[in-house]
Amino acid sequence: DVDRAAVVTGSGELLNRNNLIAVLSVIVISEHPGTTIVTNSPTTEHLKKFIMKLGGHQYRYISGYRNVINKAIELNNQGTDCQLAIETSGHAAFKENYFLDDGAYVVAKILMLLPRLVAKGETLDSLIKKLVQPKEVVEVRFKIGTKDFKATGLEVIKDFPNWIPKDWVVNLENEEGVRIDFKGEYGDGWL
């Protein structure tokens, strides 16, 4: 039903997840400087810095394509310009396209970007090289085996920050679970 899209670059690199969000961010921020981009929560700090360097803002929200779209609509109604709602899954919706979840529209926007890149001697690959890539990406989902899994999950979320090492930090810019940022001998990252 073409509600999602992914693109393969000239070098064969798959343009999805953070990379797809980065490319679409280049497009919307060039057209709407200072705009906010709503994403779901499992995006990297590298992506946030990439968006900020372009002059935009990222708003991390809970997963679910309808959730990010509704948050973008809400932000616009509150006076915050938000031109793009996108999940790492590839679901993306542009304000100019009535926030429809439309993969074909995403591909069309990227195709329209290509001549501008060529004119500057760039490619999608060179654009993505500007986004720092994580050394490792592992997504783990825990199954809660208790009868009242919701209550157990909420209790774990509440207590988890008490169990982290002192040099790790709770990232408050997160509305889904608990996001912990860490730096040190094992690298920089988040969980």
Labelled PLM ranges:
Residues 1-3, 18, 40, 101-102:
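Acidic side chains
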Residues 1-4, 89-91:
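Short glycine-rich anion-binding loops that position phosphate/pyrophosphate groups of nucleotides
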Residues 3-20, 47-48:
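Short Gly/Thr/Asp-enriched flexible loops that form oxyanion-binding sites at enzyme active sites
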Residues 11, 32-191:
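Phosphate-binding and adjacent anionic-ligand microenvironments
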Residues 18-24, 107:
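Alpha-helical metal-binding/catalytic segments enriched in His/Glu/Asp
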Residues 25-31:
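Short, basic/hydrophobic alpha-helical segments
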